[in-house]
Amino acid sequence: LKPEPVFVDTSVLLFSEDGARPAEREQVLAWLRQLWATRTGRVSVQVLNDFYLLATRQISPPMPQGDVRAEVRRYQHWRPWSPDQATVESAWSLESRFGLPFADALVVASAKAQGCTRLLSLALPHDAVYDSVQVLNPLVSAP
């Protein structure tokens, strides 16, 4: 069986760069290593844009812009989804039906658009299911 793609949200990418909690960070890195090894990681343009913005401002210490740019370039191998109008319509539907903030709904809609049934997130509730997409917290669920 071919491994299924797994969508990764901004919170997971940020945590992978934050050295404040090394044991938990290692759990996140184990997931990312698995996704690289199987070539099944997926992201969206939104996730990478948010990662760039937050990694250069939110984590302590902030990452140098050049380092974040290099990471964003590396994640281009994960086929970043560019949300189109159909993705936005799907996100609006998820927002209405599940009460999700629009940014989170757009992440879920992008995961759906890429055929992902699993979404790695530290921001959404573990094991929540939005349509066909199940949220997995990488600190709770092993790869």
Q: Can you say where each PLM-predicted feature lies in the sequence?
A:
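Short beta-strand segments at enzyme active-site cores
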Residues: R42-V45, L120-S121
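Generic alpha-helical structural context detector
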Residues: F15, L53-T56, R73
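Beta-rich strand-turn-strand
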Residues: G99-P101
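Acidic, PIN/NYN-like endoribonuclease modules and their adjacent C-terminal/linker elements
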Residues: L1-P3, V108-P143
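Acidic catalytic patch
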Residues: A20, V45-N49, R69-R97
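Short, well-structured N-terminal submotif of metal-dependent ribonuclease cores
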Residues: L1-V43, Q58-G66, A142
